[in-house]
């Protein structure tokens, strides 16, 4: 039986982290933890409560009373915030931008950090976000950093929102992706950056299946290294 690994997937918005994390977890029969969705939940709750993104004290209290769970229902992964299915509500452009500002607050990150580590410390998990391999689990056995051009990521996001019936503009969507990049990379606490030992995959000219195949290859190689019994079987 293969050792249960901690797999970290980092990268900017619109690069395919959520889809790939979900499919990789399904293939490996691991638990999928979307850390970005956790910050989106904080942003949604703050928006509903009328809290400012820089009101750190109120945000800290908000996080302390918040329950976030990931469940599978009818074959689909759902995000529950205090028991409510907010899977769609947290994916709007407004909440996406707000989540970047909210996640820049140290107390919010500290609260979410503890929860993320608690969820993943036993292994057998795929975590995706922006600082998994650098901050949340710097000792993760497998680390990926996914990249793509801002224009390609903006186009993907535009098509995703259009498919949901939203009235969006391509140029504006690309601009929002670039703004999110600047916010994520420029924040003081846990900025977006590639871990030194992460495997970089540029997805600009790759489809999901191609990226997934590459990730599965890396995981299989790492399982061979991490499982001492494999060495004995090979000798």
Swiss-Prot record:
Q: Which residues cross the membrane?
A: none
Q: Which CDD domains match?
A: CMPK (cd02020)
Q: Which SUPFAM superfamilies match?
A: P-loop containing nucleoside triphosphate hydrolases
Where ATP binds, per the record, is at 11-19
Which reactions appear under catalytic activity for this entry? CMP + ATP = CDP + ADP; dCMP + ATP = dCDP + ADP
Give the subcellular location. Answer: Cytoplasm
Q: Where is the signal peptide, in residue numbers?
A: none
Q: Which GO terms describe its biological process?
A: nucleobase-containing small molecule interconversion; pyrimidine nucleotide metabolic process
* The keyword Cytoplasm is annotated on this UniProt entry: yes
Keywords from the UniProt entry: ATP-binding, Cytoplasm, Kinase, Nucleotide-binding, Transferase
Q: What is its EC number?
A: 2.7.4.25
Gene Ontology CC terms: cytosol
Q: Does the keyword ATP-binding apply?
A: yes
Here the disulfide bonds are none
Task: Tell me the GO molecular function terms.
Answer: ATP binding; CMP kinase activity; dCMP kinase activity
Q: Which domain of life is it from?
A: Bacteria
Q: Which PANTHER family match?
A: CYTIDYLATE KINASE, CYTIDYLATE KINASE/PANTOATE-BETA-ALANINE LIGASE
Tell me its family. Belongs to the cytidylate kinase family. Type 1 subfamily.
Q: What is this protein called?
A: Cytidylate kinase
Q: What is the native source organism of this protein?
A: Syntrophotalea carbinolica (strain DSM 2380 / NBRC 103641 / GraBd1)
